[in-house]
């Protein structure tokens, strides 16, 4: 009987994102706090005689080697189980091109899933190394939880797990290219850089007010210039009661942190009149 395995693939938000400069390899040197939230893709991986096949409920994602999940399957099978194949079904719930690591989290789930499905017995360190070679966010998505990420995003330091109970996430009706945003980033134009030390102190103390107050993302400089609507969403989230609002990753998704469920529900209702993709989320634990 053919075995299959079902995994949850949580979205990622960046609670702070600083860029220290451009590296000799063309990547940017980052320092960012990444945090998983309970917006989930569902990944079903089934044994197959050979090859890799991807199907999805979404027409917005590729089902060939352009998909990071395909690349992840190709890498782990090629390295450790070259005679085996897989069929992968991606139930896509995370918005595409949104700064939420939707493709990366699917790839991480595929690495974990194939390791289990074919009893490969690979240790976390080996899986993380593989994940990092596929994409900058894939290692975090595999490790999960809350992490301070440096380098390209693959050098991870564990943070205490903290629950953020009410997050309103608004995905505007357009996409942004991560590569394009980084290409256009000019650090001399950034008006305010994150104080990651202050953020981490607030995180350690589980001080939600100062966690929110210290959220910053230098990539907003580029994304807001291209799409001023991002700044308008941020301002409106704060007007509706958010402690602070921030673009996640390279955008365009914007999240607001709320203390009270009632305020968060009202904000969701307000934004749902204008946007198709509005979510009330909390930390994924």
From Swiss-Prot:
Its family remark reads: Belongs to the GHMP kinase family. IspE subfamily.
Which residues are the active-site ones? 12, 137
Which gene is annotated as encoding this protein in its UniProt record?
Answer: ispE
UniProt binding sites for ATP: 95-105
Give the metabolic or biological pathway.
Isoprenoid biosynthesis; isopentenyl diphosphate biosynthesis via DXP pathway; isopentenyl diphosphate from 1-deoxy-D-xylulose 5-phosphate: step 3/6
Q: What is this protein called?
A: 4-diphosphocytidyl-2-C-methyl-D-erythritol kinase
Q: Coiled-coil intervals in this record? A: none
A Pfam short name: GHMP_kinases_N
Q: Which molecular-function annotations from GO does this UniProt entry contain?
A: 4-(cytidine 5'-diphospho)-2-C-methyl-D-erythritol kinase activity; ATP binding
> Its catalytic activity?
4-CDP-2-C-methyl-D-erythritol + ATP = 4-CDP-2-C-methyl-D-erythritol 2-phosphate + ADP + H(+)
Protein purpose: Catalyzes the phosphorylation of the position 2 hydroxy group of 4-diphosphocytidyl-2C-methyl-D-erythritol.
GO BP terms: namely:
isopentenyl diphosphate biosynthetic process, methylerythritol 4-phosphate pathway; terpenoid biosynthetic process
Record's keyword terms, sorted: ATP-binding, Isoprene biosynthesis, Kinase, Nucleotide-binding, Transferase
């Amino acid at each position: 009987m053919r075995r299959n395995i079902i995994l949850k693939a949580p979205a990622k938000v960046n609670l702070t994102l600083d860029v220290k400069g451009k590296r000799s390899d063309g990547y940017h040197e980052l320092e960012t706090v990444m945090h998983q939230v309970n917006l989930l893709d569902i990944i079903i991986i089934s044994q197959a005689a050979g090859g890799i096949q991807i199907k999805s409920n979404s027409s917005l994602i590729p089902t060939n080697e352009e998909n990071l999940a395909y690349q992840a399957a190709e890498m782990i099978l090629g390295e450790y189980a070259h005679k085996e194949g897989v069929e992968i079904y991606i139930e896509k719930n995370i918005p595409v091109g949104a700064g939420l690591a939707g493709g990366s989290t699917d790839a991480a789930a595929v690495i974990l899933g194939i390791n289990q499905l074919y009893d490969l017995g690979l240790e976390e360190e080996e899986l993380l190394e593989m994940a990092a070679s596929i994409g900058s966010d894939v290692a975090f998505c595999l490790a999960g939880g809350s992490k301070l990420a440096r380098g390209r995003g693959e050098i991870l330091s564990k943070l205490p797990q903290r629950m953020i109970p009410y997050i309103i996430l608004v995905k505007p009706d357009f996409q942004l290219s991560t590569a394009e945003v980084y290409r256009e980033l000019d650090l001399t134009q950034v008006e305010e850089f994150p104080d990651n030390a202050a953020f981490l102190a607030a995180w350690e103390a589980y001080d939600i007010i100062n966690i929110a107050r210290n959220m910053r993302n230098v990539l907003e400089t580029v994304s807001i210039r291209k799409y001023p609507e991002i700044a308008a969403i941020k301002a409106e989230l704060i007007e509706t009661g958010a402690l602070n609002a921030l673009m996640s990753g390279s955008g365009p998704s914007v999240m607001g942190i709320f203390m009270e469920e009632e305020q968060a529900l009202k904000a969701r209702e307000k934004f749902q009149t204008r946007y198709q993709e509005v979510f009330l989320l909390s930390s994924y634990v």
